[in-house]
């Protein structure tokens, strides 16, 4: 009897200790928590925007286990009777690692997924064009940035129902919380202002000026001292004090299409990893003096980024490569590439997500989600520059594709067209596909839909066309400044 009581007490203490340290000593948790070594119980999840899937990867083997299919690709999701999700994009997870919250921008939803079974527990619908979701550190609430409106939808994590709204500047981009759970930090994608909110009463307690209106991502350091957020349009990353008075600390020039930021805590210090979509790199910065440690080539259009539970790995979603890149933080070298679904956006590394590491229920194969073609555009021979080339991915959706171009090397705040030309040099008949305007860094993300792969890869010369970029508008544009490379 005495042995039984002692055993029960030890088990209870172990469970309490495990619960308290659930976040691990890595982001989004507190540095004081214990690290969680990489194991087969861990999972890497990626929200894949054009295949409408969530991929599930084992970090030990760096192997895709399968995908959770939340919706169908085009044109199936065009139907007025379609009930699945569209533009699977944002992602967060609960402190006990048992639930994923996955945001679908096009269907205005948050899908709650059981990490043990990969089953959808509930779908909650919110306002127009939500972007990201994350659980408060106590696990009681899920905050959703409703980017198409001007509020945070606060969802009860047990009832999966909206309990209140927090009004913020229009276009909230992302939210993250201080490791102690006291503050929520919410940047904006439409207004140059980040707000700090008291989690206890949902009141705004501070406002931080953004150097541009377009912040897609924000992260809090595990030591609770700093908040970093990215500015995608101007290619910068800002740092401010995570505690009152929430003063600005540093602005860093990071590069065109600066996407996401996250942290890895190591014996040598805490480092910030920033994905630079326009140059296909991850930049690593110290958090004490903000110096650049190294630049890591990773692949096409790096987007989401997340550390393992022990900080020995950083995983990066490659939006235009349909892959995850694994970085060894000791060497800052890419050690693995894992094929996943189409156009990964947010990713999350969840330690101890799978009680049974061999369970594959509710997972499917990639199917069409694994089919993509890659092209590149560069300056014409007479106008060569040192700017990085434009990467283009054609994501199969059956007989058509979604084209996504990560465009760089153009004039800032200028109008251009992506077009199909008769000749490889951009001459002859030119048919516009998409009009766009570059951001202040001379870059843009451009999309189009159609049977484009069949045209640009056609082996019959008379029927083949070539992708080009020309200045101007569809009704009137100039000579091509970027052309499809061999």
What spans do the regions from the language model cover?
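Short beta-strand elements
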Residues: 476-486
């Amino acid at each position: 009897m005495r042995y039984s009581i002692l055993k029960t007490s030890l088990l209870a203490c172990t469970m309490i200790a495990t619960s308290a340290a659930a976040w691990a000593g890595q982001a989004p948790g507190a540095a004081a928590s214990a690290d969680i070594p990489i194991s087969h119980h861990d999972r890497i999840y990626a929200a894949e925007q054009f295949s409408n899937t969530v991929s599930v990867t084992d970090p030990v083997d760096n192997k895709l286990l399968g995908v959770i299919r939340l919706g169908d690709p085009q044109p199936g999701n065009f139907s007025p009777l379609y009930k699945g999700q569209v533009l699977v994009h944002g992602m967060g997870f609960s402190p006990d690692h048992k639930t994923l919250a996955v945001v679908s921008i096009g269907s205005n939803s948050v899908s709650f997924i059981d990490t043990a079974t990969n089953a959808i527990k509930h779908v909650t619908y919110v306002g127009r064009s939500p972007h990201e979701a994350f659980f408060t550190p106590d696990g009681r609430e899920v905050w959703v940035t409703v980017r198409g409106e001007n509020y945070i939808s606060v969802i009860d994590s047990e009832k999966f129902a909206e309990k209140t709204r927090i009004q913020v500047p229009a276009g909230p981009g992302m939210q993250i919380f201080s490791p102690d759970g006291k503050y929520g930090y919410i940047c904006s994608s439409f207004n140059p202002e980040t707000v700090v909110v008291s989690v206890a009463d949902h009141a705004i307690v501070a406002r931080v000026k953004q150097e541009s209106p377009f912040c897609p991502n924000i992260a809090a350091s595990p030591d609770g001292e700093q908040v970093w957020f990215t500015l995608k349009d101007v290619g910068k990353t800002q740092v401010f004090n995570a505690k009152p008075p929430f003063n600005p600390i540093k602005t860093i020039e990071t590069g065109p299409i600066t996407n996401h930021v996250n942290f890895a805590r190591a014996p040598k210090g805490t480092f910030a990893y920033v994905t630079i979509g326009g140059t296909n790199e991850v930049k690593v910065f110290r958090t004490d003096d903000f110096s650049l440690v190294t630049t890591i080539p990773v692949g096409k259009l790096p987007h989401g980024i997340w550390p393992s539970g022990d900080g020995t790995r950083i995983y990066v979603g490659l939006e235009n490569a349909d892959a995850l890149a694994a970085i060894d933080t000791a060497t800052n070298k890419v050690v693995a590439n894992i094929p996943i679904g189409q156009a990964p956006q947010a990713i999350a590394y969840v330690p101890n997500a799978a009680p049974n590491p061999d369970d594959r229920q509710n997972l499917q194969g990639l199917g069409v989600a694994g089919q993509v073609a890659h092209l590149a555009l560069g300056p014409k021979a007479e106008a060569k520059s040192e700017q990085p080339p434009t990467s283009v991915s054609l994501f199969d959706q059956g007989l058509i594709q979604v084209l996504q171009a990560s465009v760089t090397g153009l004039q800032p705040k200028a109008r251009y067209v992506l077009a199909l030309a008769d000749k490889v040099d951009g001459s002859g008949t030119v048919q516009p596909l998409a009009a766009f305007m570059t951001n202040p860094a001379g870059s843009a993300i451009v999309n189009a839909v159609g049977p484009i792969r069949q045209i640009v890869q056609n082996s019959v010369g008379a029927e083949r066309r070539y992708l080009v970029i020309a200045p101007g508008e569809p009704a009137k544009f100039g000579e091509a400044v970027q052309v499809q490379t061999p």
